[in-house]
């Protein structure tokens, strides 16, 4: 068999696998939005069956045979060619999948599905005791998976693993290691705590009560759809639905869905949650469609993905220019804003206050929420903490980092679905996304000029086009660190993000 024939076989086989995985994505969307209460048990079995089938395909020995034919051939001589990128990523995925026993893959998929379903019901009733056995099982299976992956060599060119947690982190942010993360977080923590102290000591406080007036859900939904359309989200290739825990999910190139969570007496959750998930969806809608089903057409990492969502939620969506454009319309849609000025509204949506809930945190304190989770995850996978001890450790770290502590489980250790879904190693990518976002935005302004005046005129396409050309179009061609360096000329750093916050909040809290 020629290298060309082997590569064609790989393309066809991997695309077929991607079609099956996209059915799993559709089932996952349904499970978190529309499924009847009595359908969860059957759905867990469906997901387990699909996981078994996908694992069998991902470990098919023919993949190894085809890869061997292609590797070292002229097809992959240029390491940045489409074929070379695909072969590089397929090889790593194949080795990782082959190392994980089918029994473990199936058990983990079923345990995660069951834990997520139970979490949906248990969180509102604050049932930590009932949820704990589900979490313990997911944690034990995830740790077993991490031990298997830790024994593998990292991808060519990536640094070696230093600890068990690295093997999980690598699955979400390829090439990132805990030893690189921790100095970034240390620099960030110092800068954030200094800024937070100055803000809290300024004596200035916005009137956030204006955000807790009546905001009818249907009006929020209509307004959210208007924002989506104006910013460039293709509503003919996606949809917006309500859910308990907002997310974006890509079913395929013409089907990228987002969800949000509405409260009748809180403006921010529904509107800024929509903008956040829209940022994720704009990335997915901007990936090269001709490469769908291959790594060349995939998002490079969760950190880069998060950079897009945080950009649209915060750097765009919480800017004064954005609301100069949309606040007049908001006053038409929401009678509650009739007596509110643009300046007071903008100050309110940028209020800074230590809080308990990560997804509702402000830009200054958000990454301290992530630091809590990172430290707890590291402790879990270093054997320094067990799942039973999480509530107490959680409260202690919240007191230390944010000066607040939860009075219950639902607003404490049970507030996120991530651990139920086995997503250990995922949380740090949120902070990496904030750092990348600030670096990308800084570079965009250097090339396009000031962006807020454009936003005030409703001109979002030039910035979206810039991100499409420099970030989205590259797919997984480059490692995240390399992509950031190529786009901005600098390695990932906390400095641009801290500079952005200092400038913005000095103007607000002066």
UniProtKB/Swiss-Prot annotation:
Binding-site residues for Zn(2+), renumbered to this chain: 276, 280, 306
Keyword Protease: yes
Superkingdom to which the source organism belongs: Bacteria
InterPro entries (alphabetical): Peptidase_M32_Taq (IPR001333)
Presence of keyword Amino-acid biosynthesis: no
This enzyme's EC code(s): 3.4.17.19
Domain Peptidase M32: 3-506
Short sequence motif named HEXXH, residue ranges: 276-280
Placement of sequence motif DXRXT: 255-259
GO terms of molecular function: metallocarboxypeptidase activity; zinc ion binding
UniProt motif (I/NRXXA/SD) ranges: 357-362
Cofactor(s) needed: Zn(2+)
Similarity comment: Belongs to the peptidase M32 family.
Function: Broad specificity carboxypetidase that releases amino acids sequentially from the C-terminus, including neutral, aromatic, polar and basic residues, but not Pro. Has lower activity with substrates ending with Gly or Glu.
The name this protein goes by in its record: Thermostable carboxypeptidase 1
Originating species: Thermus thermophilus (strain ATCC 27634 / DSM 579 / HB8)
């Amino acid at each position: 068999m020629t290298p060309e024939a082997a590569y064609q076989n790989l393309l066809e086989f991997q695309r077929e696998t991607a079609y099956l995985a996209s059915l799993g994505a559709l089932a996952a969307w349904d499970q978190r939005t529309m499924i009847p209460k009595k359908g969860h048990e059957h759905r867990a079995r469906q997901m387990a069956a699909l996981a078994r089938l996908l694992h069998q395909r991902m470990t098919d020995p023919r993949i190894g045979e085809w890869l061997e034919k292609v590797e070292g051939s002229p097809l992959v001589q240029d390491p940045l060619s489409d074929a070379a990128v695909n072969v590089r990523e397929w090889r790593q995925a194949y080795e990782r999948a082959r190392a994980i026993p089918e029994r473990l893959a199936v058990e983990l998929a079923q345990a995660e599905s069951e834990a997520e379903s139970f979490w949906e019901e248990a969180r509102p009733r604050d049932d930590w005791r009932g949820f704990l056995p589900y979490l313990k099982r997911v944690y034990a299976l995830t740790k077993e998976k991490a031990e298997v992956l830790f024994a593998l060599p990292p991808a060519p060119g990536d640094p070696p693993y230093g600890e068990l947690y690295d093997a999980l982190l690598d699955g979400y942010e390829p090439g990132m290691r805990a030893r690189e993360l921790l100095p970034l977080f240390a620099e960030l923590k110092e800068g954030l705590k200094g800024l937070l102290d100055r803000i809290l000591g300024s004596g200035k406080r916005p009137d956030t009560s204006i955000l807790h007036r009546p905001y009818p859900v249907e009006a929020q939904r209509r307004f959210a759809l208007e924002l989506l359309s104006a910013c460039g989200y293709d509503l003919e290739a996606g949809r917006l639905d309500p859910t308990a825990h907002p997310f974006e999910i890509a079913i395929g190139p013409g089907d990228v869905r987002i969800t949000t969570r509405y409260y009748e007496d809180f403006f921010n959750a529904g509107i800024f949650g929509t903008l956040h998930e829209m940022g994720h969806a704009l990335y997915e809608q901007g990936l090269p469609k001709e490469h769908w089903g291959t790594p060349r057409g995939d998002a490079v990492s969760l950190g880069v993905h998060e950079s897009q969502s945080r950009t649209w939620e915060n750097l765009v969506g919480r800017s004064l220019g954005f609301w100069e454009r949309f606040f007049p319309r908001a006053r038409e849609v929401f009678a509650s804003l009739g007596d509110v000025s643009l300046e007071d509204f903008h100050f309110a949506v940028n209020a800074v206050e230590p809080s308990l809930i990560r997804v509702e945190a402000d830009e200054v304190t958000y990454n301290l929420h992530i630091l809590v989770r990172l430290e707890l995850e590291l402790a879990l996978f270093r054997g320094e903490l067990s799942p039973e001890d999480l509530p107490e450790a959680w409260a202690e770290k919240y007191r230390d980092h944010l000066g607040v502590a939860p009075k219950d489980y639902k607003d404490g250790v049970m507030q996120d679905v991530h651990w139920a879904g086995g997503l250990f190693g995922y949380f740090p990518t949120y902070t990496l996304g904030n750092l990348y976002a600030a670096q990308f935005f800084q570079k965009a302004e250097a090339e396009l000029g000031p962006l807020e005046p454009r936003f005030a005129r409703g001109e979002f396409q030039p910035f979206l086009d810039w991100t499409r050309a420099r970030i989205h179009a590259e797919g997984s061609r480059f490692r995240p660190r390399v992509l950031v360096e190529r786009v901005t000329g600098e390695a990932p750093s906390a400095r641009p993000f801290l500079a952005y916050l200092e400038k913005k909040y000095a103007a607000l809290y002066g």
